[in-house]
């Protein structure tokens, strides 16, 4: 579903060099402190930055060959980007209907109601929890095959965090071929969700293990 082979990206004060794989039907966790390189990986996979070297395979294709139609199968929630704070959910629905052929408006509106998200309120007036729920909801609203979720639970209280994680579980339960790469700087946030973990430190993968094995050992 996603394979990264020796992805290298160099900055003045930071260098990333990592490899990882996300298999169909699995939720893979990427854990590391802030500044470890998690967001750089997500940006590279989505084509938002150009790696210095390495290969990224997404949905079975080289990332350089991904088409606009292929990108419709990707769902992303990034920690450092999103819709303008001046938009409302009503505005966002209009955008999503134009962006994605498979946008499920009925599902989206149902979840908005369940989460109690204000339909006509500007995003800049949303709480942190509301913004987090909306980001993940947008990512899963168009039948994506691969979800890329960068710190979706950051800053959330226990109730809001569990609601976001349940949304991801429900998404995976609908299709066994789907996959998720999700990052956090706190491993305990993801222990009940992920099938396996990668630990990232200073731009390098220092640890990879299946969650069941990890919990048995520690």
Predicted segments, located by residue:
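Conserved ABC transporter NBD signature motif
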Residues: 54-65, 69-70
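Catalytic Walker B motif of ABC-type/P-loop ATPase nucleotide-binding domains
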Residues: 147-151, 156
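ABC-family P-loop ATPase nucleotide-binding domains
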Residues: 72, 78-135
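Helix-to-loop junction immediately C-terminal to a conserved catalytic motif
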Residues: 46
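Helix N-cap at the start of a conserved alpha-helix in ABC-type nucleotide-binding domains
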Residues: 36, 158-160
């Amino acid at each position: 579903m996603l394979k990264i082979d020796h992805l290298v990206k160099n900055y003045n004060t930071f260098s990333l060099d990592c490899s990882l794989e996300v298999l169909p039907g699995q939720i893979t966790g990427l854990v590391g402190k802030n500044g470890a390189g998690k967001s750089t990986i997500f940006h590279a996979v989505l084509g938002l930055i150009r790696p210095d070297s390495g290969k990224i395979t997404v949905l079975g294709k080289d990332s350089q060959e991904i088409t606009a139609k292929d990108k419709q199968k990707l769902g992303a929630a990034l920690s450092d980007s999103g819709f303008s704070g001046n938009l409302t959910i009503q505005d966002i629905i209009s955008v999503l209907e134009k962006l994605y052929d498979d946008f499920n408006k009925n599902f989206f509106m149902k979840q908005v109601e369940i989460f109690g998200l204000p339909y006509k309120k500007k995003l800049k007036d949303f709480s942190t929890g509301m913004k987090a729920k909306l980001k993940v909801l947008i990512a899963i609203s168009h039948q994506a095959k691969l979800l890329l979720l960068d710190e979706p639970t950051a800053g959330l209280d226990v109730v809001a965090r569990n609601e976001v994680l349940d949304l991801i579980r429900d998404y995976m339960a609908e299709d066994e071929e789907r996959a998720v790469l999700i990052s956090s700087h706190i491993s305990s946030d993801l222990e009940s969700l992920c099938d396996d973990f990668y630990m990232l430190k200073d731009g390098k993968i220092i640890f990879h293990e299946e969650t069941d094995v990890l919990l048995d050992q520690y």
